């Protein structure tokens, strides 16, 4: 009786996709599971769309839970396929956001692979349940920052920004 998993629980990545909104009891959920920093993703997409983070605090996770327990993303299936909020961002803009997000110390970043063959007039592309999305997760920028994140594990972050809001640098500890 009970739940039987093919893999031990501690080898799985389990989080609560609790999307932020007013009246969502984030601190209460935090007692039970990591959560999604969906409001942070919105601010990041806003900066990418504007080409500047002037007037936006892209250092603040915008969540009541501790940042080490947050799941982060630039976009999700909801923001791309359902609401189309992020659909206007180019692959290059998404990768730029991914590099900044993934280089940071906290949060567990998830990369949304847009459906293969998707366009701005056909968001779902060739999508079928279980099919792999596009190849963006193989892009050298994505691969490099994923390796950087692993190499910098445990190193504190130091974020630097230029006054114009067009350059952000993530320094990590003494190694990167």
Regions found by a protein language model. Give the residues of each.
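Active-site-proximal helices and loops of the catalytic beta/alpha 8
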Residues: 1-176
